[in-house]
């Protein structure tokens, strides 16, 4: 199992700045995670997801490129 920031097809973290309070929890559960939250009101962070779920990494960041 892994944890981390959800990543969209564009390589960017899932934004939650203007989303409802339960948005990240729902998105994490859709990916079989057990919980999640909106970190600093900026991006969705998830816990206990399957290892195959893509998460953001500084080393592989391609957001904005």
UniProtKB/Swiss-Prot annotation:
The keyword ATP-binding does not apply. Residues 2-64 form the LCN-type CS-alpha/beta domain. Keywords: Disulfide bond, Ion channel impairing toxin, Neurotoxin, Secreted, Toxin, Voltage-gated sodium channel impairing toxin. Expressed by the venom gland. Disulfide bonds join 12-63, 16-38, 24-44, 28-46. GO terms for molecular function: sodium channel inhibitor activity; toxin activity. It holds the Pfam family Toxin_3. CDD domains: neurotoxins_LC_scorpion. The keyword Disulfide bond applies. It is found in: Secreted. InterPro entries: LCN-type_CS_alpha_beta_dom, Scorpion_toxin-like, Scorpion_toxin-like_sf, Scorpion_toxinL, Scorpion_toxinL/defensin. Its main location: secreted. One of its GO terms (biological process) is defense response. One of its GO terms (cellular component) is extracellular region. Beta toxins bind voltage-independently at site-4 of sodium channels (Nav) and shift the voltage of activation toward more negative potentials thereby affecting sodium channel activation and promoting spontaneous and repetitive firing. This toxin is lethal to mice. Belongs to the long (4 C-C) scorpion toxin superfamily. Sodium channel inhibitor family. Has the structural arrangement of an alpha-helix connected to antiparallel beta-sheets by disulfide bonds (CS-alpha/beta). This is Beta-mammal toxin Tpa2.
